[in-house]
Amino acid sequence: MKSRLLVYLTLGFPDNEFVEDFVRTVPDGIVDGFELGLPSSDPRYDGPKIRSTHGNRNHFNLDKMDGILRICSDRKIRVNVLSYYSDIGNSESSNLLALSDRSVHEMIVPDLLIDYAEVADAFISRLKETGISLIPFFNAATPDRVIEKYVNKTCSWIYYGLQPSTGINVPVNISDVVERAKSVIPERDIIFGFGIRNGGDAMEIIRAGGHGIAIGSAIVDDLARHDKGAAIQKILEYREAIDSAV
């Protein structure tokens, strides 16, 4: 089975037109999915690189997603949305309906099981009512009992962080992290992200049994310079790394 490569983009960074053009320009067959991050006032589990992309919060609204979603649909590229519960909780119903109306079917909520565990079960139920599946977000610090509970409450693939946040470099044994994740979650596809530093890390994840990777921090500087070519080249390097690992 082909290993999956997901690319994270913060909507509105560096500007709305660039993001739409970038999604249109990425060569066919390279990216399996885009993670579209809703700009956050408190992206607490993102590292410095991704956090820097959230400065355009006041210049983005959900209507700006429409062009990107049309392009991805036409190109048959899967899309999920990443949003912090701290940003959508106060107007949860309208936000979920707006996403559902745009045929968004998968959502990652990094702070849900950590900071809002008391509302997580009810939120997952409301997601299901609007046709959206929660993609559980775990990392090496997530207790097994929490993983088991939310694996049983969901049916999507799993997002598993190598690190507690993106763009940081705490020493970690990648093979051990992947093997532990697979032992606790034996029957679901697991995509690893949050802390992949280079192609070597990506290869090690796949060789240890991971089903794919998600990258974002690696291309932030290129996006900030409006350099589509450099960002695409980095994505190609990760594609080649995971393809050669099989």
Language model region names:
Residues 59-104:
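Metal-dependent phosphodiesterase/phospholipase catalytic core, i.e.
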